[in-house]
């Protein structure tokens, strides 16, 4: 059901950035306990830069392999972090964040960006959230 809501707001004729802007709002509403939801996009140096998001101010640049987002980019895999304070090298963009999930957006075997969600609750994100967000990432990769 949630994936149908995502599909319903995708505009195949709109630029990627426009779709990501709307998706950041929808995902914030659909994934319970989320206080920050956004996208980081990969630049030509294989680092991440801030894309559309909902929530408080965010880090604008994340280096490859750094923090949860950079590690997801490096490993090309989704990461669920139940307690960000225990994650080696965590980048604290907000002191409110206690748990995080990051899902890479992979197109033609290359990560083009990541979906990043943060919660004030510890252990907020589940395997179901991961599966849902991986479906969303697949939709984005095919835009």
Predicted regions and their residues:
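Juxtadomain coupling helices with adjacent low-complexity linkers
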Residues: 7-9, 119-143
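A short, aliphatic-rich beta-strand micro-motif
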Residues: 99-106
């Amino acid at each position: 059901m949630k994936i149908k809501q995502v599909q319903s707001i995708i505009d195949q004729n709109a630029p990627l950035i426009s779709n990501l802007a709307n998706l950041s709002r929808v995902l914030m509403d659909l994934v319970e306990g989320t206080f920050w939801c956004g996208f980081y996009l990969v630049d030509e140096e294989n680092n991440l830069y801030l894309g559309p998001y909902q929530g408080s101010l965010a880090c604008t640049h994340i280096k490859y392999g750094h923090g949860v987002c950079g590690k997801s980019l490096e490993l090309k895999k989704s990461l669920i972090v139940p307690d960000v304070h225990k994650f080696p090298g965590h980048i604290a963009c907000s002191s409110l964040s206690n748990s995080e999930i990051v899902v890479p957006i992979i197109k033609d075997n290359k990560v083009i960006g990541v979906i990043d969600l943060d919660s004030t609750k510890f252990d907020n994100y589940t395997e179901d959230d991961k599966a849902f967000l991986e479906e969303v990432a697949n939709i984005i990769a095919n835009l």
